[in-house]
Amino acid sequence: TSRIRLGIAVTVPRVQHPLHIAARMATLDIWSKGRVDLGIGRSGYPYQMSAFGVDLANATEMVDEALEIIPRAWTEGEFSYNGKFFNIPAREVHPKPVQTPHPPMWLGCSREETFRKAGELGMGCLAMSASGPDRVTQLIKTYREGIGVANPVGKLIKDRVSISTLAICGENRKNIQERGAAILDWYRSQQAL
């Protein structure tokens, strides 16, 4: 194929260093001839992070720092960074991506404030929703308000929303509803931890 885009939804700076993310995504961008999008987020599921022996206490702040680092790694020569979580001595990161100024970036969103934040940062919005159309409409409106005042974290604005949802197929409506309710309960319990 020559047109399908490739993406990560989402990579988590709490368990991957931003320079590794930048270099790996640039490599994939080269291999795919400029068809990569980067999804980044904090992870909403503590069970995922417990496998790495980390918690989500500072995950949002780490994402914020990574969002400062990754576009710089892609677009600048030598740079340095001194943050609360990541300290990078002066260096140039290679390879550089094919896409200019850099691959589009998406933010993993699960709450209204992250939809707004994605827009304000000029990032695409990646979300999963078990909500109805009215709630999704409100979340998209919130994103659009953010895009309206965007100060891009990188050097471009990705004005897109991608929302996936669960679908369960089967022959018995009652069993499907019970299974769907159990799955939704599980997802909600993970976000609440």
Residue ranges: model-predicted function:
Residues 1-193:
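Active-site-adjacent structural elements that line small-molecule/cofactor binding pockets in enzymes
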